């Protein structure tokens, strides 16, 4: 069996229909071999940790034909293809039945209406939408296809045309898996709290549109420009489609640049839940990339315009004008300062002249007083009393000498005074003695 898988991987350029039966048979046996060991309990949606944390790139790219052959959605389809009982005897589908199931699953309107528009499956839709918050695209895709197969088998069983090859093991497996999904969905948040529009609207046929119509709508391309068309037509992006009408290329050319920026911002604010739900389930049946919408090109144009808006060429022309204005204002200030400087020297000269005049007057007065003092000093010196042409130095020298001589004479006179006073005292005493003797 592994030889068939490797053959399918190497010869990916061959016809898809020739490789598909071998691939499903191989994965079917491997899955049920593991399922028998786990007592017919299918793995929980969050059991495979590596698939849970295998994140898609942002924005998600369309898978190639080679990756589509080994996508986990095919594994899930193969894993939930009905077989017989646990003994594995004679209850498996043929390759033609499996191909018919896959074609009805991916492209049939009956499957889309029974799965998406059925009000009983609302919990499953909520579960897929809310749990797909970590861009776990592969596990969400496998879960989606498995749930579609389970609901399709239940619909065929209720319709009275059950497959004769399906046994009790397949029914118990699908019922247990649906119970697990319903229990997980009860723990999730209701999308009606987040999205204003109802999930299932029977009056409007827009939520039940076929994958072809949703794949080529301009609003879906604007929300997911690089993701492939998914078979699940979820109501959330269609609710956004009703909010934001599709913009054609002619309308986008007539819009202004600021309106384009506002439109892009509004789409980005509304789209994260829908983008996550859509990118989490890449389709296994469509291998061609959808055509790029004009809104995506408009987004690129807005990004380049934002980059140009940071440094537009019009401001480059404004810089020299601002510089010229600054230069002109600087010149005017320089002229005003020069005029002030030209006027200030005149006033300063007059002020300086006045100061000089006052200074000269004061200096003359000081000199005159000094001369008068010298003349008075000269008159006090006996040697220079009549010498009018005596210089100042001679006057000062003679004055000092005269002062010293006067001080010496003064000292002599003081000593004489003291002697005379003593003499007087003595004379007084004698006088008194004489008076006493006479009496």
From Swiss-Prot:
| Residue(s) carrying N6-acetyllysine | 143, 148, 157, 275, 317, 323, 371
**Compartmental location:** Nucleus, Nucleoplasm; Nucleus, Nucleolus; Nucleus; Cytoplasm
Posttranslational modification: Phosphorylated by PRKDC. Phosphorylation at Ser-329 by PIM2 leads to the stabilization of MYC. Phosphorylation at Ser-62 by CDK2 prevents Ras-induced senescence. Phosphorylated at Ser-62 by DYRK2; this primes the protein for subsequent phosphorylation by GSK3B at Thr-58. Phosphorylation at Thr-58 and Ser-62 by GSK3 is required for ubiquitination and degradation by the proteasome. Dephosphorylation at multiple sites by the PNUTS-PP1 complex promotes MYC stability by preventing ubiquitination by the SCF(FBXW7) complex. Ubiquitinated by the SCF(FBXW7) complex when phosphorylated at Thr-58 and Ser-62, leading to its degradation by the proteasome. Ubiquitination is counteracted by USP28 in the nucleoplasm and USP36 in the nucleolus, both interacting with of FBXW7, leading to its deubiquitination and preventing degradation. Also polyubiquitinated by the DCX(TRPC4AP) complex. Ubiquitinated by UBR5 when not forming a heterodimer with another bHLH protein, leading to its degradation: UBR5 recognizes and binds a degron that is only available upon heterodimer dissociation.
Q: Name one Pfam family in it.
A: HLH
Q: Which residues carry this modification: Phosphoserine?
A: 6, 62, 71, 81, 151, 161, 293, 314, 329, 344, 347-348
Sites where Phosphothreonine occurs are at 58, 315
| Keywords of the record | Acetylation, Activator, Chromosome, Cytoplasm, DNA-binding, Glycoprotein, Isopeptide bond, Nucleus, Phosphoprotein, Proto-oncogene, Transcription, Transcription regulation, Ubl conjugation
Show the domain comment: The 9aaTAD motif is a transactivation domain present in a large number of yeast and animal transcription factors.
This one is known as Myc proto-oncogene protein
């Amino acid at each position: 069996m592994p030889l068939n898988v490797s053959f399918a991987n190497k010869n990916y350029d061959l016809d898809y229909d020739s490789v598909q039966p071998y691939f499903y048979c191989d994965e079917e046996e491997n899955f049920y071999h593991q399922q028998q060991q786990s007592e017919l309990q299918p793995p929980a949606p969050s059991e495979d940790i590596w698939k849970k944390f295998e994140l898609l790139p942002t924005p998600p790219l369309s898978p190639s034909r080679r990756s589509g052959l080994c996508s986990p959605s095919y594994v899930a389809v193969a894993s939930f293809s009905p077989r017989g009982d646990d003994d594995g005897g004679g209850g498996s589908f043929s390759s033609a039945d499996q191909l018919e199931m896959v074609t009805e699953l991916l492209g049939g309107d009956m499957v889309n209406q029974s799965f998406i528009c059925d009000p009983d499956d609302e919990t499953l839709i909520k579960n897929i939408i809310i749990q797909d918050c970590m861009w776990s695209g592969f596990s969400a895709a496998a879960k989606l296809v498995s749930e579609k197969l389970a609901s399709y088998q239940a619909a065929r069983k209720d319709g009275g045309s059950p497959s004769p090859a399906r046994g009790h093991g397949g029914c118990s497996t699908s019922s247990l898996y649906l119970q697990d999904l319903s229990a997980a969905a009860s723990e999730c948040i209701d999308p009606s709290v987040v999205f204003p529009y109802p999930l299932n609207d029977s009056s409007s046929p827009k939520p039940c549109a076929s994958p072809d119509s949703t794949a080529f709508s301009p609003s879906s391309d604007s929300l997911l420009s690089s993701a492939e068309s998914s078979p699940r037509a979820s109501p959330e992006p269609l609710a956004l489609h009703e909010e934001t009408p599709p913009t054609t290329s002619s309308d986008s050319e007539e819009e202004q640049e600021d309106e384009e920026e506002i439109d892009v911002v509004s789409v980005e604010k509304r789209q994260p839940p829908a983008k996550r739900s859509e990118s989490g389930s890449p389709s296994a049946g469509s291998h061609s990339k959808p055509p790029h919408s004009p809104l995506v090109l408009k987004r690129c144009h807005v990004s380049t315009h934002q980059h140009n808006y940071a440094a537009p060429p019009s401001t480059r022309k404004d810089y020299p004008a601002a510089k010229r204005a600054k230069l002109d204002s600087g010149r005017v200030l320089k002229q005003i300062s020069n005029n002030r400087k030209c006027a200030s020297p005149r006033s300063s000269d007059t002020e300086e002249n006045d100061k000089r005049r006052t200074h000269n007057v004061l200096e003359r007065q000081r000199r005159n007083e000094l001369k008068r003092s010298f003349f008075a000093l000269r008159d006090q010196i006996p040697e220079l009393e009549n010498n009018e042409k005596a210089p100042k130095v001679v006057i000062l020298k003679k004055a000092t000498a005269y002062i010293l001589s006067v001080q010496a004479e003064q000292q002599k006179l003081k000593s004489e005074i003291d002697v005379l006073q003593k003499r007087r005292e003595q004379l007084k005493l004698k006088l008194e003695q004489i008076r006493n003797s006479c009496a």
